[in-house]
Amino acid sequence: MKRRDFLLSLAAAACLPGCHSPSKPGLPPGNLLGAGLERGHRLRGRDFPAPSETRQVGVAIVGGGIAGLSSAWKLNKSGFGDFRLFELEDETGGNARAGHNAVSAYPWGAHYLPLPGPEARDVRELLADLGVLRGDPHAEAPVYDERFLCFAPQERLYRHGIWQEGLLPQIGATRRDQEQYRRFFDLLERYRQQRSATGERAFAIPAVLSSRDPELLALDTLSMRAFMLQHGLDSEPLHWYVNYGCRDDYGSHHGEVSAWAGLHYFLSRDGFAANGDGEQVLTWPEGNAWLAQQMRQRFDERVETAALVHRIAEYPRHVELDVYLARENRTVRWRANRVIFAAPVFVLPHVVADLDSSLRDAASAVQYAPWLVANLTLGEALQHGNGAA
């Protein structure tokens, strides 16, 4: 299903509460929130006013999601203040924005952060700067502010009328299934312990710091499903579990996700807290919008929202950016020494003049999967039923 059709079907369902089976309750009242499409779609028509003035800046950052905000944070933290961040929407945050109601703040999208491992040095330094991480950010197991560590039960699976802890199916699993579970996790552990000749872990975050051993890179040539079958793992509930993980992280079936990517999902999140465990995550009522807001506060005066970058042109000594200011209905031309492009990749061919054909083809080939976060306000406590509370 195309993203547009998916969103329209949700909107239609929300608008037709009376059109349902008499035996089933209708959808509760609510809103479908997301990116404002109209402003971005102006890139197709190119009907922007000519620039009314020209300004100078050292670094221009295109996009105010977590990537753009963290780039700005890094520059600012390093003592470099000659930058400007441009965000299409009325608020920064991108997929890490949030809303509020009478009960609580709630995330629109990204809603937790796995504990960063030792390779994620910049992430740890960011968390230390924001007061989330206490003490040495490069300790093997740093101390985190316990207000932000998720101690509550994180995942539940409803199977055969019973709630169980975790997502790996246990209720109804046969002895053969359990044996294959053990073999699968033993296999993961062998990869977890593997190191390259120069000491890199097999799978790390950032991914660029993962081992480049040919044996591991060859895993990118077969699917995660094929990899499992190659190792004699054909348990149906085990395949369901792995497929769930691939759909969650990549938006695709484990028969389409490469074995390298599938293993990276299971093995790259290895951060620990001195005052917690490796299964915990960092989270806030508003999700990762908390991180976005905390970063922006440090350089708010250098952020422009409702600012659509519709042209980027590179010259020998500078880069030109034409920025449409929606609130003022005018275009400002910026001349920058450097540009950090932190907007979605598919936008590149629409804004960069004379984009290299290989980059254009690569950007056009990127596919995105729809991702919906549902926030529910409950009128009364849930009835847990049988199984794990």
Q: Where are the regions that the model predicts?
A:
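Conserved hydrophobic helix-helix packing surfaces used for dimerization/oligomerization
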Residues: 59-61, 83
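Mid-domain catalytic core of redox enzymes
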Residues: 305-389
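Extreme N-terminal leader/targeting segments of oxidoreductases
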Residues: 2-58, 77
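N-terminal Rossmann-fold NAD(P) dinucleotide-binding loop
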Residues: 68
